[in-house]
């Protein structure tokens, strides 16, 4: 069975994608990854620490796909890690205009 990793770096990621993840689990083995680091550490530190944790998570298991939701700042290094490791990225809900957050 093909495997998908879903990095849920924000609590909203999992809640908004719950139905999609349930549907995907019918045909794929889905693993949800969440960082243990505190997002209050600042954008740069949070991104870096997420990337390190995610890389360590990927070292334990091979994945066929990575499902990346939205365009949050900490997902860029995570997507880069997937690209470096040859894991195809499925990117959803990206492309919204920036302005409210950073």
Model-derived segments and spans:
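N-terminal subdomain of nucleotide-sugar transferases
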Residues: 1-36
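Active-site and donor-binding regions of nucleotide-sugar-utilizing enzymes
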Residues: 7-10, 14, 39-102
